[in-house]
């Protein structure tokens, strides 16, 4: 931001550096109270949520431009819940999560998925799209593809964002951290990921990084992020209502349930869905189309 590197999510270090002060936690709380727009009692969108709880200056510097790039929308068009996921701390903890335990698979997600699909009872077919006729081949289907695509977009296409990646190879260290966000609207990419920092116990002479460019997901693109807009919920509800009436199929994952999910939640819900299915078999009950609230 403005040629400087700041700590995110916003914490005491960020506040002191950005405003050029040396606040204690209590002083920082008082400072932000002065910056916040207290006239916004019930924030109705992302922008109002930001103005109410962090103030205009921090919002403009760290969130406005980044949000426009990431979602292709002005923050006033996004629900307040999008910002509620991001913590603001009045200490020097710059961790995004408050979980008791954090981690990644020891050998990475690629190896984890590889181990799953190599199971003797799992067959993988590439370059083959799912069709409704295939449902008769199975007792039950778990569908993790896009919800609207399952119905051939009969009511219209739901909104998604997709990503383009530009690879950077550096012979040493590139940025000194795993992920760095670029908040300015003038920088076309949203962030750069330097993957070796996710596994600091490894030693690498070179480094591979990727710039991420977010854009609207069009036909033929890979959908990454569901865009849940308040003015588009009628279309989503049409698909959800129809899906809930289905038999012998369960919609799962980020695309199947049309929700923004972190990886830990995705895995936890997959395990939960498996438990629900096994219980339904044991008790001879009907398996629901959704095992989570959508």
Where are these predicted regions, by residue range?
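Mid-domain catalytic core of redox enzymes
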Residues: 128-238, 242
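Short acidic-glycine loop/turn motifs at beta-strand connectors
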Residues: 2-3, 199
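Short capping micro-motif at the N-terminus of alpha-helices
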Residues: 8-10
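Short glycine- and Lys/Arg-enriched binding-loop motifs that mark or flank ligand-binding interfaces
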Residues: 104, 141, 249-252
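Active-site/ligand-binding neighborhood in enzyme catalytic cores
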Residues: 4, 14-138
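Conserved flavin/dinucleotide-binding core of flavoenzymes
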Residues: 13, 193-294
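A structural signal for the hydrophobic beta-strands that form the central parallel beta-sheet
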Residues: 124-126, 143, 251
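Surface-exposed flexible segments
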Residues: 82-89, 155, 262-273
């Amino acid at each position: 931001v403005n040629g400087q590197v700041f700590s995110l999510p916003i914490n005491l270090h960020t506040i002191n550096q950005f405003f050029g002060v040396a606040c204690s936690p209590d002083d920082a709380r008082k400072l932000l109270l002065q910056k916040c727009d207290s006239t916004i009692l019930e924030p109705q969108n992302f922008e109002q949520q930001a103005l109410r709880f962090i103030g205009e200056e921090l919002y403009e510097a760290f969130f406005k431009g980044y949000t426009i790039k990431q979602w292709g929308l002005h923050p006033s068009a996004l629900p307040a819940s999008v910002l509620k996921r991001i913590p603001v701390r009045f200490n020097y903890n710059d961790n995004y999560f408050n979980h008791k335990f954090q981690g990644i698979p020891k050998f990475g997600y690629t190896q984890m998925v590889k181990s799953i699909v190599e199971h003797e009872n799992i067959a993988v077919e590439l370059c083959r799209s799912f069709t409704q006729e295939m449902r008769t081949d199975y007792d039950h289907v778990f569908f993790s593809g896009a919800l609207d695509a399952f119905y051939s977009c009969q009511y219209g296409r739901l909104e998604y964002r997709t990503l383009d990646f530009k690879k950077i190879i550096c012979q040493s260290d590139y940025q000194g951290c795993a992920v760095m966000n670029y908040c300015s609207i003038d920088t076309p990419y949203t962030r750069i990921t330097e993957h070796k920092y996710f596994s600091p116990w490894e030693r690498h002479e070179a480094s591979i990084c990727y710039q991420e460019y977010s854009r609207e997901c069009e036909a033929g693109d890979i959908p990454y992020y569901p865009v849940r807009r308040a003015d588009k919920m009628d279309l989503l509800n049409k698909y959800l209502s129809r899906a809930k009436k289905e038999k012998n199929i369960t919609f799962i994952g980020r695309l199947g349930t049309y929700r923004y999910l972190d990886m830990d939640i995705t895995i936890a819900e997959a395990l939960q869905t498996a438990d629900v299915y096994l219980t339904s078999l044991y008790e001879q009950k009907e398996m629901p189309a959704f095992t989570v609230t959508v």
